[in-house]
Swiss-Prot record:
PANTHER family: LD18447P. SMART domains: PCRF. Belongs to the prokaryotic/mitochondrial release factor family. Keywords: Cytoplasm, Methylation, Protein biosynthesis. This is Peptide chain release factor 1. Methylated by PrmC. Methylation increases the termination efficiency of RF1. The gene is prfA. Residues 284-303 are annotated as: Disordered.
Amino acid sequence: MVSQRLEELAAEFGLVERALGDPAMLADPREYARLTRRHRELTPIVTLYREHAVLSSDLEGARELLADPDMRELAQGEIESLSARLAQIEAELEVLLLPTDPDDAKNVILELRAGAGGAEAALFAVDLLRMYTRYAEGAGLKLNVLDASESDLGGASKVVAEVTGEFAFRAFKWERGVHRVQRVPATESQGRIHTSTVTVAVLPEAEQGEVSVDPSEVRIDVFRSQGAGGQGVNTTDSAVRAVYRPGTPDEIVVVCQDSRSQIKNREKALVVLASRLAERERAAREERERETRAAQVGTGERSEKIRTYNYPQNRVTDHRLEGDAKNFALDSVMAGGLAPIVAALSRDERERQLLELQGAEGERGTYGAA
């Protein structure tokens, strides 16, 4: 029942408020930050829930006045007004009660890999990185390149970056998948349009203790930094390569060379490694769930083409959307204007979840008193 869920959240809200008011909580910054985020998530829900309880009581009182001929007309107007507001609150609560992604508040490990198209794909990877950097800045986030494999003509065959800030994963999670570009390369003398691809992976950054990595299974190599992220620091062995289970099918290689400090590069490399291991575990778990329910899940698969950037027509098409809603102005998107696409995808996801919630509940309006 919705009312039971709201009662549970109201009780949790009280516990969170009391915990935040405890001076001893300041000794644990990580837990304090977690509780602060949770308080922020619960506040709009509990505020509406309490308003619903007050208005429900007022509505009951107004209905009692219908028996009084002198008050009937006034009561009827009050009933209509209260009923309209209650319906609005219930609709808002339905949306707020939709399941949230537990990874939304995490930082992001962003990986771009040039695919089909050779040098042109590598150039487009740099264009996407520039787009993401501008998008991050506009969203109040920070994007920092950890490692990049430069290619000819100023492209990059691979880029690994970290995006930090409040709800970074929520801002970037829709970017995972294959991005296709259609344009005339600078090296094309005949003016022919080429099609190239870049694969983007978006990993929620693993938090401390989330994934256990056995140090004996990781080989650490150090070398002199070079290329993007390493300029000016290549006089010492500050770059770090972490190799998980080297020489086995499970091998994972992570390189970090953005800092002048070998210690900091090592720490960041291990964070990226843990994030990849967590993603591997999530992917395996999701695959088992798909096999169990014998269903195919499309949106979000890394191998899926999610978006096409058509330069001749100045159009970006997101293939997860439908109709005219799937097309956006390319120049705006490449300047970092991803927010409209993210909003449209998030809206579609909420609508899908809402339909599932309504189907599970069977009926609406089951809201109890606070």
